[in-house]
Amino acid sequence: MSTLAPRVVLVSRRSELDELLARHGTMAAAAYFLRQRGRDLDEVAARHAAQQAALTTAGAAVPADWRRGHLDRADLSRFLFAPEDVVVAVGQDGLVANVAKYLDGQPVIGVNPAPDRNPGVLVRHPPDRLRRLLRDLPGLPVQERTMVSAALDDGQELLGLNEIYFGHVTHQSARYTLSTSDGSRERHSSSGVVVGTGTGATGWCSSIARQRADAPSPPAPGEAALTWFVREAWPSPATGVTLTSGRLDGAQTLELASEGEGLVVFADGLEPDRLELSWGQRVTVGVAARKLRLVM
């Protein structure tokens, strides 16, 4: 058993003001840019201040004898989480999804710095509650949420909390063969395939499902099941439009075999952190063995 004190890893992403200053250099230039688009710098600055205040409160909540770290979302793929880490995501619900794919059982506490803007599905706690949450952490209920796995035939694997996307890197037409666990098989030309979890059922998959009269019923967030959708399948003499949606329950999988170059797999909107397929490579998509452990 490790004798190390727990380490709290605060995870955040750059605010809109941070992005504006990185692009335009000064507050005056950022204000001018926003005015040209009918927006006000004060509103952007207020959101930035709320996020900074939440991060300050979260940092002060860490017990003095615990270790701590602060990580930007852009650096997640280069950071090594330790088994004793406690992850505190300060930001939007999507930030929890972004960090989940890099974890292996570490508890996650979602802190909502802007409840007037963020629904709080995954970032459930106000900043001033964090001190008590960390103190009582061993006895708090943890909700396990299903994740989706995409495994290439060369051993590479990618996880997602909301969904994974398979398709062309530019989102143009991709050619591939889709195979299901029951032996069904069809060649496709489409703008990609989205496979989502119960957590992701309110996001991208929901947008697609609303356009389908025969959309499969979405799973619950903790249910070991996924739904999948083919986007804009194109009928031709060589490609079909019959296998365009379905559910994967338990150990069922979906296999996608590339029939071209430039095909990729990424999860939860993080396109730079992706798997790349060459012609003939296969990716198998199914319920992941890992789960997100979300502190309630």
Features from the language model and the residues they span:
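A solvent-exposed, charged loop/short amphipathic helix patch at secondary-structure junctions
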Residues: 22-45
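A short, basic/flexible loop-to-alpha-helix module at the beginning of a structural domain
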Residues: 73-81
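Short Gly/Thr/Asp-enriched flexible loops that form oxyanion-binding sites at enzyme active sites
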Residues: 95-104, 205-209
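Structural motif
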Residues: 85-86
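Short, acidic/small-residue loops that bind anionic groups at enzyme active sites
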Residues: 102-124
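Catalytic phosphate-donor-binding core of small-molecule kinases
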Residues: 2-6, 14, 19, 39, ...
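N-terminal glycine-rich "phosphate-gripper" loop used for MgATP/nucleotide binding
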Residues: 89-93
